[in-house]
Amino acid sequence: MEPLAKARSLLLGSAMILLAIGIVMIYSASAIYSFDRMGDSGYFIKRHLVYVGVGTLLAFWASSLDYKNLRKHALPILGTAIGLLVFVLIPHVGHSTGGARRWFKVLGFSFQPSEFLKIALIFYMADYLERKCSSLNDLKRTVLPALFILGISAGLVLKQPDLGTAVTISLVIFILFFAAGFDIKYLLVIITGAVPALAYLMLAKPYRRKRILAFFHPWDDPRGVGFQIIQSFLALGSGGIFGVGLGKSQQKLFYLPESHTDFIFSIIGEELGFIGASSVVVLFIVFIFAGMVIVFRARNRFSQLLGLGLISLISFEAMINIGVSIGALPTKGLSLPFISYGGSALLANTIALGLLVNISKELPQEGHPET
């Protein structure tokens, strides 16, 4: 089997297994909660299966479309995504939950435009950086406009507020700046400005300060800000090597909040043990490895940048989610790709998967023979 075909098989295989794990674990983690709140133990899994079906169709669509021809629409696509971010902030238009205004409600389903923005921004930046390759380090013509677009996008996400998504988007685009060949002096200036800005954003809001304190000292307030991460620790710790058994989690019994969304990895660790949790990590490593093989063998610079942005996005989201669950990072509120309940995120993941498959179908770049 040729290298690109192998990479494509690994990419699709790992993604399909992760999706299957997600279906099983969402039902396991949410059944009791959904019966208590909705009167139907299958409420969340039924909705998730709808998203899986739609996501599968979107993945097939993204894997077969002429994405290079779509480049001429990169700016309108990004403009639409930014417009949706503006509209979602309008009271009575965007749906507000827990003080955050991030969703549209459509026919009983929620749509989060920031998930669409992630794909749109990566697509636009890949096109922009490829078009500007001859003047890549021109401050006025290339660097500042790119930073302006990133600033507008991240700024609107911050207004929702959603710091985790804003940071993730910024990290991915920084990777693209680096890969495209931005001068090191510009990259250092960006880092120098970004670090204090991030520190300010993390400390400016009381609830974010509490999350930082809970990250360092969760046991100082075990019934308050430290409660969620402590329950995550208890879930992971009680799972041991082989787990307590599928469906037998104690932490999902109203102890661990967001057990079927942001903290589903903890339930995996509890029910399937270290073996199950490690298997999920290995599947993500396989997915990322296969994605990077596709990126390095991509036919042209645009495809390389697009693929790198997409695989970086899924990589960062997986690392951050797992990092939060094991206490290595402060609570961020990001879902685990392909596994967590969350329709908009799943649809974005499947579109990214489809585009990566699409890129893998092209002939390899010169210098990377299929031998």
Name each model-derived stretch.
Residues 28-31, 249, 340:
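Short linear Ser/Thr-Pro motifs
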Residues 1-16:
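N-terminal membrane topogenic signal
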Residues 214, 218-265, 272-276:
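TM-adjacent membrane-interface loops and short helices in multi-pass inner/ER membrane proteins
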Residues 31-32, 259, 315:
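Transmembrane-helix terminus/interface motifs of multi-pass secondary transporters
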Residues 12-20, 24-28, 37-228, 266-324, ...:
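Hydrophobic alpha-helical transmembrane segments of multi-pass inner membrane proteins, especially
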Residues 1, 321-371:
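A juxtamembrane structural motif centered on a specific transmembrane helix
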Residues 260-261, 265-269, 343-351:
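Hydrophobic alpha-helical transmembrane segments and immediately flanking/interface helices
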Residues 107-117, 159-161, 240-245, 334-348:
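Glycine/serine-rich anion-binding loops at beta->alpha junctions
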